[in-house]
A protein has these predicted regions:
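Short glycine/serine/threonine/alanine-rich loop segments
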Residues: 11-13, 50, 111, 149, ...
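A structural signal for isolated positions on well-ordered beta-strands in alpha/beta enzyme cores
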Residues: 14-16, 52, 82, 114, ...
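Conserved beta-strand termini and adjacent loop/short-helix elements that scaffold enzyme active sites
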Residues: 20, 56, 116-118, 160, ...
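Classical nucleotidyltransferase
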Residues: 64-170, 193
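Phosphate/ribose-recognition catalytic cores of enzymes acting on nucleotide-derived substrates
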Residues: 160-241
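Short secondary-structure boundary segments
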Residues: 57, 87, 205-207
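Short amphipathic alpha-helical segment that frequently serves as the phosphate-/nucleotide-binding helix
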Residues: 1-2, 218
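Core alpha/beta nucleotide-donor-binding catalytic domains of modification enzymes
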Residues: 2-78
Length: 241
């Protein structure tokens, strides 16, 4: 992303992120995990200074585009001048296109192909698979280093039984989107962005242990030095460790 933004700035081009409304692998899987929801991706890109975000519906017709047809579509629809991608980039029907095809078709379609080598950490490639593994094992500090930011969850505050408020500790309950990857059940140190202000706190990931009965997985966050009502308000919880 930073490479694309830097290259665009050097040549006076707008930085456009092209993504899909659902992960392509979701077509064939009933269960899958995402690091960021569509809303969270938009937040990340906006903070980074991306000019435009295109969220394309991943339809059957689109899925069957050949690598060349996919690149041709980008040229015709948004007049792409430069495409920045990693060495593990795949595109087109059945992921038939790679960075090699991206370079091969560049002259014919009139764009510049920029290929970025994967970065490594502790002798291994930094990848979404590796980051998912760290989060799934609860290694939040390691995951955050690989991400370059603190892994976070966004969503509105939901009504609970208000037990925290009765003991003087304001809490915010959140129900993540179905496929959002959560760390294992447990308690985590977090930072909370609420009503435009930053707060420290702790989050419990699990089946809301302060509430009796069986509940779906959720996140219950205790905010330090906060007084107010977060029900229905957008909250960002960043997991630190």
């Amino acid at each position: 992303l930073m490479e694309a933004m830097q290259k665009g700035k050097e040549q006076g081009l707008k930085c456009v992120i092209f993504t899909f409304d659902i992960p392509p692998k979701a077509i064939h899987k009933d269960t899958y995990n995402v690091l960021s929801t569509n809303e969270e991706k938009a937040h990340i890109f906006a903070e980074a200074g991306v000019d435009y975000l295109i969220e394309c519906p991943f339809t059957d017709d689109f899925r069957q585009l050949s690598p060349y047809a996919f690149l041709q579509m980008l040229k015709e629809k948004i007049n792409v001048k430069m495409i920045v991608a990693g060495t593990d980039f795949h595109f087109g029907y059945q992921r038939a296109g790679s960075f090699r095809e991206l370079q091969q078709y560049a002259d014919d379609l009139g764009y510049e192909a920029v290929i970025v080598k994967k970065k490594q950490y502790k002798g291994e490639d930094i990848s979404s698979t590796r980051i998912r593994k760290e989060i799934a094992e609860g290694n939040m500090e390691e995951a955050n280093y690989l991400l370059g930011y603190s892994y976070f969850l966004t969503g509105p505050g939901l009504h609970g039984n208000e037990i925290g408020r009765t003991i003087g500790i304001p809490t915010a309950n959140q129900r993540p989107e179905e496929f959002k990857l959560l760390p294992p059940k447990g308690v985590y140190a977090v930072e909370i962005l609420a009503e435009g202000k930053q707060y420290d706190g702790i989050s419990n990931v699990g089946c809301k242990p302060t509430i009796e009965g069986v509940n779906p997985m959720g996140v219950e966050t205790f905010l330090f030095d906060y007084s107010g009502n977060l029900y229905g308000k957008d909250i960002k919880v960043s997991f630190l460790k």
